[in-house]
C-alpha cells in the first residue's frame, strides 16, 4: 500500500478538477499537501474539504520570481506535481504571437522553473518525486492547439532530460498524459459532441480526475523508485504508444 506519511507535496493548478483530485489523493495517503493556484477562493474550498494537513499558496505562474519563491518558501519538499496549464486555442494562421507565448510561458517555462527549484531542494535530501502533467495531444498533436501541443510535447522532452540529470540523486522525474477527462468543459458538450469523442476511445468513456490522481500517487511513491523519464498515458486506449 502507498504511504506518503511525513512527506510534503506541492501541487500546482490545485484549484482545477484534476489538480484537486491529485491533492485529495496525496492527502488521503498521508502527505502534507501545499495546494497552489491563482484562484484563492477555490483553493480555500478545497482546503475546507481536506480539513487539515494542508497549506494554501496563491501563485501567479506568469511571474517567474513568484515561481521560484513558491518553492523557496518550502522547507522540505518531497513531491512536486506540476499540473497548472492554460489553453489559447485557434488555428495557427489566426494565432497571435502573444497567444503562443502565454501558453508556453505557463505550461512550459513556469514548470521548468518549478522543476529546477525543486531539484535543488531534493538533491540535498537525495530524494524526490517530480510528476509533470502533460497531455495526450503532446504526442498526437491536435488542430487548433499548436501552442498547447508544443508546450505539452516540450514538457515531455524536459521531463526526460531532467530525469537523466538527477537519476543518481534519488530523484525521479516522470510525466502523466491525460486523455479526455470529465470536467466542467466536457460537461458543456452536447450529446453529439460527446459521442464523437467517446467513439475514439476503446474504453468507450471519459476518464475521471481520480484516474489521473491514482497515476500520480503511484509515481509519487517509493514503489516507483525504478521508473524515471517516462510518460504514463491515461487515456482509455485512445492513444497507444
Curated annotation (Swiss-Prot):
**Pathway field:** Lipid metabolism; fatty acid biosynthesis
For this UniProt record, the keywords arranged alphabetically read as follows:
Fatty acid biosynthesis, Fatty acid metabolism, Lipid biosynthesis, Lipid metabolism, NADP, Oxidoreductase
Q: Which reaction does it catalyse?
A: a (3R)-hydroxyacyl-[ACP] + NADP(+) = a 3-oxoacyl-[ACP] + NADPH + H(+)
Enumerate the InterPro entries for this protein: 3oxo_ACP_reduc, NAD(P)-bd_dom_sf, Sc_DH/Rdtase_CS, SDR, SDR_fam
The GO annotation for biological process reads:
fatty acid elongation
The parts of the chain that form a coiled coil are none
**The protein's assembly and partners:** Homotetramer.
The protein, known as: 3-oxoacyl-[acyl-carrier-protein] reductase FabG
Q: In the UniProt record, what gene is named as encoding this protein?
A: fabG
Amino acid at each position: 500500500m502507498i504511504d506518503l506519511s511525513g512527506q510534503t507535496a506541492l501541487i500546482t493548478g490545485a484549484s482545477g478538477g484534476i489538480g484537486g483530485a491529485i491533492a485529495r489523493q496525496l492527502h488521503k495517503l498521508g502527505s502534507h499537501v501545499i495546494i497552489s493556484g491563482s484562484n484563492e477562493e477555490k483553493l480555500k474550498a478545497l482546503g475546507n474539504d481536506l480539513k487539515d494537513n494542508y497549506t494554501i499558496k496563491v501563485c501567479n505562474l506568469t511571474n517567474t520570481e513568484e515561481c521560484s519563491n513558491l518553492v523557496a518558501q518550502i522547507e522540505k519538499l518531497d513531491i512536486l506535481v506540476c499540473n497548472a496549464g492554460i489553453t489559447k486555442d485557434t488555428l495557427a494562421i489566426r494565432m497571435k504571437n502573444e497567444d503562443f507565448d502565454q501558453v508556453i510561458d505557463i505550461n512550459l517555462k513556469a514548470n521548468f522553473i518549478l522543476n529546477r527549484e525543486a531539484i535543488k531542494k531534493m538533491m540535498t535530501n537525495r530524494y524526490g518525486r517530480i510528476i509533470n502533467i502533460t497531455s495526450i495531444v503532446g504526442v498526437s498533436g491536435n488542430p487548433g492547439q499548436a501552442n498547447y501541443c508544443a508546450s505539452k510535447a516540450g514538457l515531455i522532452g524536459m521531463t526526460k532530460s531532467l530525469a537523466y540529470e538527477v537519476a543518481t540523486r534519488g530523484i525521479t522525474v516522470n510525466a502523466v498524459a491525460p486523455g479526455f477527462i470529465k470536467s466542467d468543459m466536457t460537461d458543456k458538450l452536447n450529446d453529439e459532441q460527446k459521442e464523437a469523442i467517446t467513439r475514439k476511445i476503446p474504453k468507450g468513456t471519459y476518464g475521471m480526475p481520480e484516474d489521473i490522481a491514482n497515476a500520480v500517487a503511484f509515481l509519487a511513491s517509493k514503489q516507483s523508485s525504478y521508473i524515471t523519464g517516462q510518460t504514463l498515458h491515461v487515456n482509455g486506449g485512445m492513444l497507444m504508444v
